[in-house]
């Protein structure tokens, strides 16, 4: 068992060697012992003994035959025990007495740790106790190290052998050797130090507890038994007793076994998987097969000897991997021709498969050491392709084998069934399985064909499968019974004792055949084909003349290979023979027969294979933009060139085009249609026809008899039905998938190609002068690199770092002013820059780097490069420095590394820029090693940018393909194993060594660190690292050992070839070559000496005749080794020569892309971009031009104009000449300077500035102006562009700049669509727009339908906005938000209008009259909004997420069925807001199997459901749950019964405003509805409208209705219970609305109030609060005629409401039944409310107190807090001073302006106090009783 801690309880001075964490753990253990044994507190020696009992892992080998084996922690670990480990510390005193009596020796009794025992006691009692991490770890240690002998099995010999390798050379003191046990063995043996191995904290914790090599099998035994004896020591082996006098110990009562904690209980599964600690990982490590072969999706399996599978597979791979063309064009023709493989490739593929499958050799090994068998046809990429296709072949073969077994079982079942009754004929619906079916299955070559065969099998035999399985089950049971009877009979012959001794466990199968049939009974197949087959229609189908197989052969060969067998009677006459109760007429029989024949044709594998080949070759697509696509797809879109495409062959798609099209389709920008019509075969005249029509002709009989023509017609219909309904739609799905996969493969190849270019670069090698011999500049051991990283922000300091030759950071420098300018006019800035340059110069002089690299962050890198070059030039002169290059390199890798977990762990204290600098320097030292830093468990290598579409390919595939590049490159370069152990930078490359992987590499590294020794030769990979033979053969050639560094440090034989690419299997040949080259005699043979000499003079190898040597080797049976011998010669010439491409400077284009962060795809000539004008350029006049200058006199103002700069304010001619002489003339304007968005400077020549002639560019543009330009030239050397802003160029009139259109571009359709769009715009302009109104109300907007909907989209639920109606001038529309994206539009009719622009004196919704807009909102819309919110907050409400063409009922039905599946006992129901009918809620419920849908309509009176009105959700649900079984009418869609159309509205009754108002439940009103993006209903048109004020928020309390007289009831004013706020905004929270003193419907048309208030002008945020003194005023101070702005509603004057006195208020939500009985006007309503008020107030006083306390805490929380019991004052206060308005609203909730404290809620109206979900009260809102028992 591995050690628990590094220390084995040494003295305190020994503990100093432990790290901090280990010291803490040791202290915990000491404290535990101290607590449990206070009497021995001062006895340190006793403490050491106790600690040894717990954590000492010193191994002891025991020879008593108890047989410890390797079921312990690791495969090579011995059982490590203390001298008394064999005694369980849980033994009681009497147990010790018994053991001592039997053993005859005195046993030392250990004390038990009380704290650890307390854990056991608590757990055994079943109590859940919180145990800290330390206690858990100690408990696990106790469980692991205190197990008895019986819990451990036998160890293998290999475990004993491996255990020795793990022990270190350090031993304890010599005195320990004299302490022996009874058998004379030393107690203390070797021990070793252990260092933390895992960087991850959780994995290190696991190592601390279990040791490095713990085995998960050890922990499985802890979970085997549920019960055990309380003491394991109670039972003991009889062999330990003395003689036969053994006593039997009574067993203690069994009790629940303590649940042992394993590693799986402590660590998360994701952590175990990340660290490769699962059982599967352990198995992979142990198996002697390359790790990647084990991890392949289809593991590599050997081929049986004598099988021809490899020949078949090689042919298959050659055909499908190297010859078969892709459907789309993935390679250019020249590349495709270059990649074509000759037929000789088949043998090379077969040999490769032999290596892979039978010899388990990985691809890199084959590519490097079996070249003779694969070259020249197959390179390493081809070998990986063979490896990949081998997986597909194995998977295909396995599936074919399973299907073949199914075929054989079915054929045997058919044989048994027919043999049971040989007299009966074969039924018509039975198709016998023939040998041809097995042949067809054997000929399957692809997964698609296999799927076809499988579907054909299911079509014909699926109905027989249950019976076949039942018969097989019956046979198996019968065989078991017979076998049992035979055993019993045989046992009876041998006697009863033998019979009793035979115990055979019986399977838990029920032998009852009836039960078997019941268990196998499946759901009846109710498909049309199954119904028709049962009705006997399959017999009729056999009379159509050809079997499906025969017709498929005709179709394949494209001629009538099989003649049609024609019936002598017509189909109608024949159909009469098949009439049945199911099919009463011949038409029904014929219709069924057509379906059966068509279905059989569609499932015929040969037909589908033929159709697939033809369709994939000839398929075409149409592409059309959607409405959004027509607008959003511009010339910068990747699919612009294919915006309109007609009949484009899919074979013409190139590269990743289809992924781009799919992305546009997913974004609803394009519609891709695969045409079902495609070309047939060419006719005699050369013009192909339609393929489907040609297919019909192959099923026709060329005769003219009537009944023949009838049969021909039926056959043609069958063919058309089969192809167009089933075959072609299926092929379209396959084709889409194939095109997508091919485009993904293109992206993968692009990604790997990019990584290949990055990894193929060799470490930088400076070119020092030949005569430069200074030792400090030597590059033999490597180079020093200075890396510099900066941020374009000048306020961020730059950093540079210098690496040593090993890659460590030796020093760094902070440069805060390196980006500043040396020639700056700011003297301080200049001095700072020079100081940084001096520091950098001193730094370079001290560190002497071989090269300086700068991160390509921006163009500032070029300035830094110039500064450093100047420094280095000075150092060359003054310090005799060699020429040092300064390079600018890509910094993408450095930036990702700086933010990666690896970078964080490597440099925890470094800032990101310093990490970047270190990564830049290391990248120059070795790009492969630096890129491998991102190859960790988090797969950060995927963060690099390889391709714009890399996110569109599966992550696993991309990671696998990138790994192949690392494998190839690591195999080419090799890995120094000893250097890797010393320097962790190369650790990540170990997993890419051939034969290894993350798991095997991790184990190898662990062993090397444990042994703490260097590998001296490759043989130690087997002897020390325990690699198996297969893995060793694969990896040994790629692991190099620097033999020169070993020197004299080892006595072992040093093999110089271990430092070369020569594989150990060819060492003898290399030695032979060296001996022959040195011309040694056989007697004088010294291979080692010969090799050393040949390495010093490798030119002597050129004299060898390697071809003759190869022939001799082949003659001796070693195979062809010609290429290998030449490789050995090259390797001996230069050991492990680096074949990577030397570093080269970036080209001008590469540097341009790096510094601008652009690519040729993102920045190109012709692109339209935006630019900012930075200045103007002029061409100064030269001497001759000045002499011939001719100033112009302007007649308009009698002034003179300069002929060059066109300045025209010179009063005298002499001043023009003075203008020239003073050199003040800038010259003639030549162009405009601009700066692009990416920072590049640009220039617009004056001729390209405009289509018209421009003489002065300053008249056209100004500095800092943003303009659109088109790039017409890119100068990559000067990092500048030339642009044009001419209208003709921007519109690209001549089609010379925009991306080239596709060859199949549909210009005709594009023109038609553009014409439709322009016509629609013209019609929209001509359409009559709504009349703008002059209505002073914060919720009124002069906006169109679309504008209002867009405005309300972000508003809270229940927000309302009123707007002009497009119906007529005497109509308004009230739009309120029902739910997200669902809006209801209510038509409001006006009467008594003074003019077209004013508000009517009376407003009507249906037959109900309202006085003003406030009353509509407060009495009609707000109650509905509150009712809707109560439903939305109900727990069984589901948001309406329906999009596109989905049906909301279907969505709810799917949701209900999912819930029903989870809990079938309940009747589930849900509400959702209806999009089809806004204002209604869909109630869907699932009683049994059919989902029912009904509508609940929100009304001002409550909820209308099944013609009844309910005031609360509770009452609605209570009634619904009692009457849900009552018959209901089917809910109609949007119709007149639900929505009253505007043109069918009943005329209003002629009643005055003071007459009674109908509040009945059926009061009609006109309602329309819409959702976002929809079209206004009932004539509501979208038109361009003006501004507006503010939407009315239902979260605002209505404090009064403004009237113009004091005769209105309730003239006093009441205040809401909200806190004060004077800054309301749209959707404001908890802010009451106070209307202005101006009555809305009496608004005169006055000049000072003619402007409609604008919404959104200086609107404060909802969260802003202000005091009562913060008020704003608009208009006159008195308030009359003033129009308040949205943020000025608290304004002063008499316009405010909320002055003194009134106390009458009206409850928003009185019970609808009471209101219906009381015919009251507004005054009577006030009185009635006052009468009801005391009854309600008393019963709800405590409730309001609770609510007041709750809302005082919750009020600022959410946007829909609405903590209000709504109270309305009916008084219209026109007088009163500045006491009104928001500022004076009292903060105290539930207090009115008159000082009356009144409750706002009643039992009859729960909605009057809405709560948010954050409130605890909302948890109980609504009836929580389910339709059925929820439990």
From Swiss-Prot:
Domain S1 motif: 1217-1286
Modification sites for Phosphoserine: 34, 36-37, 66, 70, 75, 124, 151, 156, 159, 173, 1661, 1664, 1815
SH2 domain span: 1329-1440
Keyword Phosphoprotein annotated: yes
InterPro entries: HHH_9 (IPR041692), NA-bd_OB-fold (IPR012340), RNaseH-like_sf (IPR012337), RuvA_2-like (IPR010994), S1_domain (IPR003029), SH2_dom_sf (IPR036860), Spt6_acidic_N_dom (IPR028083), Spt6_death-like (IPR042066)
Coiled-coil features, chain-numbered ranges: 7-59, 467-494
Region span, Disordered: 1-99, 117-199, 221-240, 470-501, 1531-1587, 1602-1716, 1730-1831
Superkingdom of origin organism: Eukaryota
Main location: nucleus
Oligomer and partners: Self associates. Interacts with RNA polymerase II. Interacts with the FACT complex, which is composed of dre4/Spt16 and Ssrp/Ssrp1. Interacts with the exosome, a complex with 3'-5' exoribonuclease activity which is composed of at least Csl4, Dis3, Mtr3, Rrp4, Rrp6, Rrp40, Rrp42, Rrp46 and Ski6. Interacts with the DRB sensitivity-inducing factor complex (the DSIF complex), which is composed of Spt4 and Spt5.
Similarity remark: Belongs to the SPT6 family.
Function according to Swiss-Prot or TrEMBL: Histone H3-H4 chaperone that plays a role in maintenance of chromatin structure during RNA polymerase II transcription elongation. Required for the transcriptional induction of heat shock response genes and for maximal recruitment of two other elongation factors, Spt5 and Paf1, to the induced Hsp70. Plays a critical role in normal fly development throughout the lifecycle.
Protein name: Transcription elongation factor SPT6
Organism: Drosophila melanogaster
Originating gene: Spt6
């Amino acid at each position: 068992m591995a050690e628990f801690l590094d220390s084995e309880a040494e003295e305190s001075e020994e503990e100093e060697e432990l790290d901090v964490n280990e010291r803490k753990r040791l202290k915990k253990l000491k404290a535990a012992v101290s607590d449990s044994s206070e009497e021995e507190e001062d006895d340190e020696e006793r403490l050491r003994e106790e600690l040894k009992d717990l954590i000492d892992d010193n191994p002891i080998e025991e020879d008593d035959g108890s047989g410890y084996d390797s079921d312990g922690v690791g495969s090579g670990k011995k059982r490590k025990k203390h001298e008394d480990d064999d005694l369980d510390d849980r033994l009681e005193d009497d147990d010790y007495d018994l053991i001592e009596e039997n053993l005859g020796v005195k046993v030392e009794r250990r004390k038990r740790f009380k704290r650890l025992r307390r854990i056991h006691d608590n757990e055994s009692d079943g109590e859940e106790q919180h145990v800290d991490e330390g206690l858990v770890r100690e408990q696990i240690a106790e469980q692991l190290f205190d197990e008895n002998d019986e819990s451990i099995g036998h160890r293998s010999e290999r475990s004993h052998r491996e255990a020795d390798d793990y022990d270190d050379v350090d031993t304890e003191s010599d005195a320990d050797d004299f302490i022996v046990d009874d058998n004379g063995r030393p107690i203390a043996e070797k021990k070793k130090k252990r260092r933390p191995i895992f960087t991850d904290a959780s994995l290190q914790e696991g190592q601390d507890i279990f040791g490095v090599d713990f085995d998960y099998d050890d922990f499985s035994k802890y979970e085997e038994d549920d019960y055990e004896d309380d003491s394991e020591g109670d039972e003991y082996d009889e062999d330990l007793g003395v003689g036969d006098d053994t006593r039997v110990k009574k067993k203690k009562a069994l009790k629940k076994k303590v649940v042992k904690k394993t590693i799986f209980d402590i660590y998360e599964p994701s952590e175990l998987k990340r660290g490769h600690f699962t059982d599967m990982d352990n198995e992979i490590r142990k198996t002697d097969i390359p790790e990647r072969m084990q991890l392949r999706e289809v593991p590599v399996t050997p081929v049986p000897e004598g099988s021809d599978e490899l020949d078949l597979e090689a042919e298959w791979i050659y055909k499908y991997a190297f010859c078969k063309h892709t459907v789309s064009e993935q390679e250019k023709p020249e590349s495709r021709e270059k990649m074509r493989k000759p037929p000789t490739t088949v043998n090379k593929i077969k040999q490769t498969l032999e290596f892979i499958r039978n010899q388990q050799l990985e691809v890199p090994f084959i590519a490097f050491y079996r070249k003779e068998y694969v070259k020249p046809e197959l390179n390493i990429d081809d070998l990986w392709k063979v490896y990949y296709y081998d997986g597909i072949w194995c998977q295909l073969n396995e599936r074919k084998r399973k299907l073949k077994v199914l075929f054989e079982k079915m054929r045997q079942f058919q044989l048994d069934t027919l043999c049971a009754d040989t007299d009966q004929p074969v039924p018509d619906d039975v198709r016998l399985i023939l040998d041809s079916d097995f042949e067809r299955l054997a000929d399957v070559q692809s997964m698609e064909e296999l799927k076809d065969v499988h579907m054909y099998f299911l079509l014909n035999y699926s109905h027989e499968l249950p019976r076949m399985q039942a018969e097989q089950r019956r046979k198996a049971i019968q065989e078991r019974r017979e076998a049992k009877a035979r055993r019993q009979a045989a046992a009876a012959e041998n006697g009863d004792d033998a019979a009793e001794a035979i115990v055979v466990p019986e399977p838990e199968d029920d032998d009852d055949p009836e039960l078997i049939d019941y268990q196998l009974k499946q759901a009846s197949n109710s498909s049309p084909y199954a119904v028709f087959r049962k009705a006997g229609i399959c017999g009729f189908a056999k009379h159509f003349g050809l079997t499906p197989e025969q017709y498929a052969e005709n179709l394949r060969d494209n001629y009538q290979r099989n003649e049609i067998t024609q019936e002598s009677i017509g189909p109608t006459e024949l159909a009469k023979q098949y009439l049945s109760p199911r099919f009463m007429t011949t038409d029904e029989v014929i219709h069924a027969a057509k379906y059966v024949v068509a279905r059989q044709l569609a499932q015929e594998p040969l037909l589908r294979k033929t159709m697939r080949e033809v369709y994939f070759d000839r398929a075409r697509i149409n592409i059309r933009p959607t409405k959004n696509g027509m607008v959003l797809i511009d010339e910068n879109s990747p699919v612009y060139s294919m915006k309109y495409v007609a009949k484009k062959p899919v074979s013409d798609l190139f590269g990743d085009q289809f992924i781009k099209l799919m992305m546009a389709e997913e974004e609803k920008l394009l519609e891709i249609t695969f045409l079902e019509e495609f070309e047939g075969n060419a006719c005699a005249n050369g013009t192909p026809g339609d393929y489907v029509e040609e297919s019909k002709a192959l099923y026709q009989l060329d005769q003219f008899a009537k009944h023949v023509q009838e049969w021909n017609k039926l056959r043609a219909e069958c063919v058309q039905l089969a192809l167009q309904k089933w075959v072609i739609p299926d092929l379209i799905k396959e084709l889409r998938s194939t095109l997508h996969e091919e485009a993904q493969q293109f992206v993968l190849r692009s990604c790997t190609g990019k990584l290949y270019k990055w990894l193929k670069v060799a470490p930088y090698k400076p070119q020092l002068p030949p005569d430069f011999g200074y030792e400090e500049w030597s590059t033999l051991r490597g180079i020093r690199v200075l890396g510099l990283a900066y941020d374009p922000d000048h306020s961020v300091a730059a950093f540079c770092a210098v690496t040593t030759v090993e890659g460590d950071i030796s020093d760094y420098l902070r440069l805060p002013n390196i980006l500043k300018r040396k020639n700056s006019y700011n003297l301080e800035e200049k001095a700072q820059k020079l100081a940084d340059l001096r520091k950098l110069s001193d730094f370079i002089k001290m560190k002497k780097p071989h090269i300086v690299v700068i991160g390509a962050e921006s163009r500032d890198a070029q300035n830094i490069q110039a500064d450093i070059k100047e420094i280095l030039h000075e150092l060359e002169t003054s310090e005799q420095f060699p020429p040092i290059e300064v390079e600018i390199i890509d910094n993408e890798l450095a930036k990702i590394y700086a933010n990666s977990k690896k970078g964080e762990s490597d440099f925890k204290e470094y800032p990101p820029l310093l990490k970047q600098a270190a990564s830049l320097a290391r990248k120059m030292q070795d790009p492969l090693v630096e890129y491998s830093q991102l190859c960790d468990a988090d797969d950060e290598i995927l963060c690099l940018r390889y391709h714009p579409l890399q996110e569109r390919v599966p992550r696993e595939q991309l990671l696998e393909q990138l790994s192949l590049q690392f494998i190839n490159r690591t195999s080419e370069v090799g890995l120094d194993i000893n250097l890797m152990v010393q320097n962790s930078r190369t650790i990540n490359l170990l997993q890419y060594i051939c034969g290894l992987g993350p798991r095997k590499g991790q184990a190898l590294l662990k062993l090397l660190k444990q042994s703490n020794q260097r590998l001296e030769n490759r043989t130690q990979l087997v002897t020390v690292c325990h690699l198996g033979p297969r893995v060793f053969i694969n990896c040994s050639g790629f692991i190099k050992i620097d033999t020169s560094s070993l020197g004299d440090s080892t006595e072992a034989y040093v093999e110089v070839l271990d430092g070369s690419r020569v594989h150990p299997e060819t060492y003898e040949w290399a030695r032979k070559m060296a001996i022959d080259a040195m011309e040694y005699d056989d007697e004088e043979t010294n291979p080692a000496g010969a090799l050393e000499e040949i390495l010093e003079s490798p030119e002597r190898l050129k004299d060898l005749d390697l071809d003759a040597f190869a022939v001799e080797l082949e003659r001796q049976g070693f195979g062809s080794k010609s290429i290998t011998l030449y490789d050995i010669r090259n390797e001996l010439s230069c050991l492990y020569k680096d074949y990577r491409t030397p570093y080269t400077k970036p080209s001008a284009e590469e540097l341009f892309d790096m510094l601008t962060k652009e690519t040729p795809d993102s920045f190109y000539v012709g692109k339209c971009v935006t630019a900012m004008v930075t200045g103007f350029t002029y061409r100064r006049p030269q001497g001759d031009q000045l002499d011939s200058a001719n100033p112009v006199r302007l007649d308009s103002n009698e002034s003179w104009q300069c002929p060059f700069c066109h300045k025209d304010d010179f009063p005298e001619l002499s001043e023009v000449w003075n203008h020239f002489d003073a050199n003040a003339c800038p010259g003639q304007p030549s162009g405009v300077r601009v700066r692009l968005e990416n920072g590049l400077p640009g220039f617009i020549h004056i001729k390209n500035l405009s289509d018209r002639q421009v003489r002065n560019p300053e008249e056209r543009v100004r500095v800092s102006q943003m303009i659109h330009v088109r790039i017409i030239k890119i100068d990559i050397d000067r990092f500048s562009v030339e642009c044009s802003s001419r209208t003709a160029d921007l519109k690209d009139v001549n089609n010379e700049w925009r991306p080239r259109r596709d060859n199949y571009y549909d210009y005709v359709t594009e023109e038609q669509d553009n014409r439709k769009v322009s016509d629609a715009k013209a019609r929209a302009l001509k359409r009559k727009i709504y009349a703008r109104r002059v209505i002073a109300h914060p919720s009124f907007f002069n906006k169109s339908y679309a504008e209002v909907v867009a405005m309300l989209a972000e508003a809270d639920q229940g927000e309302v906005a009123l707007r002009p109606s497009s119906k007529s001038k005497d109509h308004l529309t009230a739009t309120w938000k029902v739910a997200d994206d669902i809006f209801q539009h209510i038509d409001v009719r006006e009467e008594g209008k003074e003019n077209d622009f004013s508000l009517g004196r009376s407003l009507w919704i249906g037959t109900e009259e309202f006085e003003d807009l406030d009353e509509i909102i407060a009495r009609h819309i707000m109650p509905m909004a509150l009712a809707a919110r109560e439903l939305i907050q109900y727990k069984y409400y589901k948001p309406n997420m329906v999009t596109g063409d989905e049906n909301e009922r279907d969505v709810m039905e799917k949701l209900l069925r999912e819930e029903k599946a989870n809990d079938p006992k309940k009747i589930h129901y849900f509400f959702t807001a209806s999009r089809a009918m806004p204002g209604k809620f869909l109630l869907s419920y699932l009683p049994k199997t059919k989902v029912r849908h009904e509508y609940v309509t929100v009304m001002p009176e409550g909820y209308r459901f099944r013609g009844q009105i309910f005031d609360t959700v509770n009452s609605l649900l209570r009634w619904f749950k009692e009457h849900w079984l009552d018959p209901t009418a089917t809910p109609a869609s949007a119709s007149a019964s639900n929505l009253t159309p505007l043109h069918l509205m009943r005329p209003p009754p002629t009643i005055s405003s003071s007459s009674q108002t109908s509040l009945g439940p059926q009061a009609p009103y006109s309602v329309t509805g819409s959702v976002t993006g929809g079209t206004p209903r009932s004539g509501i048109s979208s038109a361009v409208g003006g501004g507006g004020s503010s939407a009315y928020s239902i979260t605002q309390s209505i404090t009064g209705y403004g009237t113009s007289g004091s005769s209105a009831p309730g003239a006093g004013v009441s205040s809401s219970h909200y806190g004060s706020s004077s800054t309301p905004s749209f959707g404001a929270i908890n802010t009451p609305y106070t209307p202005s003193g101006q009555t809305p419907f009496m608004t005169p048309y006055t000049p000072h109030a003619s402007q409609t208030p604008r919404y959104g002008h200086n609107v404060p945020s909802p969260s802003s609060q202000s005091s009562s003194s913060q008020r704003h005023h608009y208009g006159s101070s008195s308030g009359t005629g003033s129009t308040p702005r949205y943020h000025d509603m608290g304004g002063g004057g008499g316009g405010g409401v909320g002055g003194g006195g009134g106390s009458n208020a009206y409850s928003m939500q009185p019970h609808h039944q009471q209101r219906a009985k009381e015919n009251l006007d507004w005054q009577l309503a006030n009185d009635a409310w006052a009468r009801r008020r005391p009854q309600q107030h008393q019963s709800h006083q405590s409730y309001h107190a609770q609510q007041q306390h709750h809302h005082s805490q919750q009020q600022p929380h959410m946007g829909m807090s609405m903590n209000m019991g709504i109270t309305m004052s009916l008084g219209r206060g026109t007088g009163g001073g500045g006491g009104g308005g928001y500022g004076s609203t009292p903060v105290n909730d539930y207090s009115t302006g008159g000082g009356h404290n009144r409750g706002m809620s009643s039992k009859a109206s729960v909605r009057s106090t809405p709560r948010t979900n954050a409130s605890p009260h909302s948890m109980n809102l609504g009836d929580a009783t389910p339709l059925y028992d929820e439990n």
